[in-house]
């Protein structure tokens, strides 16, 4: 009887340890995705050359086309502004006043975006 209880206890302990280890691995892998984006006011100079997601509204009259596929614009969270440089195809919903999320790196006070995501409201409006 003593041996059965001990074996059952060892099995339960191994199951709990495995479950905690699995949860730990999942949380470690999700670490970069827990905070989807940071507003410009939360970006520090400390985060230079680190992969970031920055979100805000495209500031009015801030879009400058540098080349056919290169653009610069400013995003704001009404506290601080951040200049974004992007090379590539713009998303279809990109415009002034639109909420966007830029994925890239901060370098010399400018954000070098490698990908842009546009945000939209929850109302669906089919094209006419």
UniProtKB/Swiss-Prot annotation:
Residues 30-128 are periplasmic. It comes from the Bacteria. GO terms for molecular function: heme binding; metal ion binding. Heme binds at residues 120, 124. Gene3D superfamilies: Nucleic acid-binding proteins (2.40.50.140). Belongs to the CcmE/CycJ family. Heme chaperone required for the biogenesis of c-type cytochromes. Transiently binds heme delivered by CcmC and transfers the heme to apo-cytochromes in a process facilitated by CcmF and CcmH. This is Cytochrome c-type biogenesis protein CcmE. It comes from Rickettsia canadensis (strain McKiel).
